[in-house]
């Protein structure tokens, strides 16, 4: 995997490219809160064919903390400019957790550049069914990334799945953590504040795969079903795992994603036509 830096949208961004099948669009991976490139390596390594692009958000990993806050729309634009820098017109986009918000924003804001969309362990943002308050409070600090004892203590409560039974497994999952700064972490939190995709999810035209963990304390599974109902051409896959299934179930997750990315356009179109009847008009109009 090639790692380098680029100046895009006013930021110096650390990015990575894993070479793969050049006959298809690359998979653009948008990571979660405080998560640097290397945290996604188990999933990237499990993928067989596609080229993969991922990067550290400003203030995370090897990307310097910016002097001022940003919004998801800014990061979506940064993402588009990174694709320009790398010479790609379009990509399949996978967003996990916080990165799922950016993936939704990118698919909406730059729809012609997003061929297929994968939303993993994520939600529509502020207008979601939230986690329980103790879980949310644990996420307000990046302490789990820098304090191993604290990570062991909170892993099961925050991430669920295997970490409830084996908290020490979080040490393996966090082997590649490259924590940058508290400022960068809090900027990510601030970017998500007040953001929601709920009013426009029904406009997304991309075939969409929604993946959720059955035991995800951070993003309750009902949010996946809400997104499936609102996005016209969406399917859902539930994994018997917690929030970090892309890491803890990397092989299984990779098979599901690759199957979705390589299915025929005809089958996706047929499914889209069937699904479109579920959302005939804006959900805001239906609520009025």
Language-model features: locations:
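Conserved alpha/beta-hydrolase catalytic His-Asp/Glu region
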Residues: 128-130, 148-200
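Catalytic histidine-centered segment of alpha/beta-hydrolase-like enzymes
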Residues: 241-254
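Conserved HGGG/HGGXW glycine-rich cap/lid loop of the alpha/beta-hydrolase fold
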Residues: 11-64
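Flexible "cap/lid" loop of the alpha/beta hydrolase fold
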Residues: 104, 108, 114-144
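Conserved alpha/beta-hydrolase "acid-adjacent" motif
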Residues: 217-223
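Short beta-strand/loop motif that positions the catalytic acidic residue
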Residues: 204, 210-212, 216
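Active-site loop/oxyanion-hole signature of alpha/beta-hydrolase fold enzymes
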Residues: 54-94
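Gly/Ala-rich beta-loop-alpha elbow adjacent to hydrolase catalytic centers
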Residues: 95, 99, 103
